[in-house]
Amino acid sequence: MSVGVAVLGSGNIGTDLMIKVLRLSDSLRMVAMAGIDSGSDGLARARRLGVTTTADGVAGLVTLPEFADVELVFDATSAGAHRHHDSVLRAYGRIVVDLTPAAIGPYVVPPVNLDEHLAETNVNMVTCGGQATVPIVAAIGRVTPVAYGEIVASIASKSAGPGTRANIDEFTETTARAIEVVGGADRGKAIIVLNPADPPLLMRDTVYCLCPDTDADRSAIIAAVTDMVGAVQEYVPGYRLKQEVQFDRVDSYLPALGGHLTGLQVSVFLEVSGAGHYLPEYAGNLDIMTSAALRTAERLIGRRAVTA
C-alpha cells in the first residue's frame, strides 16, 4: 500500500521530485504540491497531472482536505523558509525530508548513513554537491584516515533556479560540514561554480582528499571508490567516474590544516547527468538531489511500515 506525500516548493527541484514520485515510486503516492507562485510551471504541471495544488505555501497545504492523507512532506524551498515549515509540520506529526541547506535534522547521504537515521522525523539531504561527493570522501575514509576533504561542484548555470542562487552561502557551509560529519574528514571545504557555458555542461565534481598515510593501500582506495560509485548509481544512473582515481605525494605546509602534512592526495573526478524527468540531462545536480530524497523517503516509510 502506498503512502501519501506532498511537495513544498514548485520550482525546479520540487517539480522534478513530484514527477519522480509519480513515475518511479511504488511505495509513495503524490497527493499535493504547495508553492507561493500561482503562475509557476510547477503548479501548472501538477494540476495537469491530477495533483492537488495550493499557492499559499505551507499554510495552504495544511488546510487542504487531502493533507489528512499526507504522511511525509518534501521541502524543496529555501533554508530560511524550511525553519518555519518544520515548526508547522512538526505540530502535525509529519515526516519531513528537507532538500534545503537548513539542516535542522541530521545530514543523510543514502549509501553512507541512511540506515542510522531511519527513525528520524526530519532529515536533511545536504546539497547536490554533498550528495555527489560525500560518498567518495566516506569511501576513501574507510580505507585510510582523511585529514582534509575539499570538493568543487560545477553546475550548469541554467539548472540553478532562484532557490539555488539564494542559498549559495548555505550550500558551501552545509556541504563542508557534511564532508566532516558524514564523510569523516577532519576538515572539509566546498566550492560551487555556476558554469554559464552554452550549450550547458553536465554537472562535474572534483574531490580532493589529503591522507596522512603516505603508504595507504591505493588498490583498496580505488576499489572502495568504485564500489561507492556503484552504490550511488543504483538510484542515480547518470553518476559516474570521469577519470581514473589519481594519487600524488604531499609534503608541504597546508593553510587549510594550519600545519605541515606529509601524506597522500587522492583526486577523484565525477560527472553526473540527469534522467531528464523534468529538466534536461545537464541538470544532474537536480537529479542527484531528488533521487537521493526519493530513496530516503521510501526507506523512511518502509521502516515505519515494518515497525508499525
UniProtKB/Swiss-Prot annotation:
Q: Is the keyword Oxidoreductase assigned to this protein?
A: yes
What top-level class of enzyme does the UniProt entry assign?
Answer: oxidoreductase
MF annotations from Gene Ontology: acetaldehyde dehydrogenase (acetylating) activity; NAD binding
Q: Does the keyword NAD apply?
A: yes
Q: Which reaction does it catalyse?
A: acetaldehyde + NAD(+) + CoA = acetyl-CoA + NADH + H(+)
Binding of NAD(+): at which residues? S10, G11, N12, I13, S159, A160, G161, P162, G163, T164, R165, A166, N167, N285
Q: Which domain of life is it from?
A: Bacteria
Its keywords, alphabetically, are: Aromatic hydrocarbons catabolism, NAD, Oxidoreductase
Per the UniProt entry, the Enzyme Commission number(s) are 1.2.1.10
Which residues are named in the active-site annotation?
C128
InterPro entries attached here? Acetaldehyde_dehydrogenase, Acetylaldehyde_DH_C, NAD(P)-bd_dom_sf, Semialdehyde_DH_NAD-bd
| One Pfam family named in its UniProt record | Semialdhyde_dh
Q: Name one GO biological process term.
A: catabolic process
Q: Which family does it belong to?
A: Belongs to the acetaldehyde dehydrogenase family.
User: What protein name does the entry list?
Assistant: Acetaldehyde dehydrogenase 1
Q: Which organism is it from?
A: Salinispora arenicola (strain CNS-205)
Source organism lineage? Bacteria, Bacillati, Actinomycetota, Actinomycetes, Micromonosporales
